[in-house]
Amino acid sequence: MSSGALLPKPQMRGLLAKRLRVHIAGAFIVALGVAAAYKFGVAEPRKKAYAEFYRNYDSMKDFEEMRKAGIFQSAK
């Protein structure tokens, strides 16, 4: 017997399409994971920090401090 009879024939058609299906699905899953990680790891904490800052922010107090420091030329 020859060794060629023991090995199955390799699939020659549709190799690229099969690999693309697998890799596109994997890329989609990775992209969703990265988007979720960014949203909950970066965007949500940033949004909470901005909300907390503006909840306690006094613009007139900030303006008066800048005016006393001499930043403005028109408001002395």
UniProtKB/Swiss-Prot annotation:
Residues 4-22 are mitochondrial matrix. The chain crosses the membrane at residues 23-44. Keywords: Acetylation, Membrane, Mitochondrion, Mitochondrion inner membrane, Transmembrane, Transmembrane helix. It is found in: Mitochondrion inner membrane. Acetylation of Lys-61 is observed in liver mitochondria from fasted mice but not from fed mice. Its main location: mitochondrion. Residues 45-76 are mitochondrial intermembrane. Gene3D superfamilies: Mitochondrial cytochrome c oxidase subunit VIc/VIIs. Coiled coil: none annotated. GO terms for cellular component: mitochondrial inner membrane; mitochondrion; respiratory chain complex IV. Pathway: Energy metabolism; oxidative phosphorylation. One of its GO terms (biological process) is oxidative phosphorylation. Pfam families: COX6C. The keyword Transmembrane helix applies. CDD domains: CcO_VIc. It is a single-pass membrane protein. InterPro entries: Cytochrome_c_oxidase_VIc, Cytochrome_c_oxidase_VIc/VIIs, Cytochrome_c_oxidase_VIc_sf. Component of the cytochrome c oxidase, the last enzyme in the mitochondrial electron transport chain which drives oxidative phosphorylation. The respiratory chain contains 3 multisubunit complexes succinate dehydrogenase (complex II, CII), ubiquinol-cytochrome c oxidoreductase (cytochrome b-c1 complex, complex III, CIII) and cytochrome c oxidase (complex IV, CIV), that cooperate to transfer electrons derived from NADH and succinate to molecular oxygen, creating an electrochemical gradient over the inner membrane that drives transmembrane transport and the ATP synthase. Belongs to the cytochrome c oxidase subunit 6c family. Component of the cytochrome c oxidase (complex IV, CIV), a multisubunit enzyme composed of 14 subunits. The complex is composed of a catalytic core of 3 subunits MT-CO1, MT-CO2 and MT-CO3, encoded in the mitochondrial DNA, and 11 supernumerary subunits COX4I, COX5A, COX5B, COX6A, COX6B, COX6C, COX7A, COX7B, COX7C, COX8 and NDUFA4, which are encoded in the nuclear genome. This is Cytochrome c oxidase subunit 6C. It comes from Mus musculus (Mouse).
